[in-house]
Design a protein with these regions (language model features):
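Glycine-rich phosphate-binding loops that contact phosphosugars or nucleotide phosphates
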Residues: 47-180
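HTH-adjacent hinge/linker in prokaryotic transcriptional regulators
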Residues: 1-38
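Glycine-rich phosphate/diphosphate-binding loops that line cofactor/substrate pockets in enzymes
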Residues: 37-49
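A ubiquitous structural signal for well-ordered alpha-helices
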Residues: 23-26, 30, 42-45, 67, ...
Length: 180
């Protein structure tokens, strides 16, 4: 079999990934009072905080950096935590008036949960943007904004679309900017 024939056969035999279906479903779910209330609660947490810290691991870490910068552009003091092993040493005097925004598809990553628990020990607030309300992260957070995307894996790597996360981050930043 020639390489071109093999590639053509492979192309037709593999199911095509269409991100539009889950994204359309997500956007439909955002057009309701429950989602608007979650956004209002999250916006209030951001506006009440003296500082906002974003945290995620892997792709979620890259989006945490983006979210931090985007929120800073809206006039909020915001930083991202890039190292999941950062010894937080959270004391109430340091984090009591701050917010940790945690991005995680699974909501179950051990290192991420350890950071959240340390942060909460210092009386900081936690906003989780995660794929499900049934994760450990969701149970720990003060406010959870779920996005319910079908999980896509490549071995141990997570390829779940992050379009809803970007949508939520940008929407929150715009709401915060308008509220100031």
């Amino acid at each position: 079999m020639l390489k071109q024939e093999w590639l053509a056969q492979k192309k037709t035999s593999m199911p095509e990934y269409d991100v539009m279906l889950p994204i359309t479903e997500f956007l439909d779910k955002t057009n309701n009072e429950t989602f608007r209330q979650l956004l209002s609660q999250a916006t209030a947490l951001i506006l009440e905080a003296q500082a906002v810290f974003f945290f995620g691991i892997g792709t979620s870490g890259a989006l945490a950096q983006y979210g931090s910068r985007y929120l800073a552009n809206a006039g909020i003091f915001s930083l991202s935590i890039n190292d999941p092993f950062t010894p937080v040493g959270m004391r109430e005097t340091v984090v009591a008036d701050t917010l940790l925004v945690v991005l995680s598809v699974s909501g179950e990553t051990t290192e991420m949960l350890a950071q959240v628990e340390q942060y909460q020990a210092g009386k900081g607030k936690v906003l989780a943007i995660t794929n499900s309300t049934h994760s450990t992260l969701a149970r720990l957070a003060d406010v959870v904004i779920p996005y319910y995307m079908p999980e896509e894996k490549n071995g141990s790597l997570n390829n779940t679309t992050q379009i809803p996360v970007v949508y939520i981050l940008e929407l929150l930043a715009h709401r915060v900017a308008c509220a100031q």
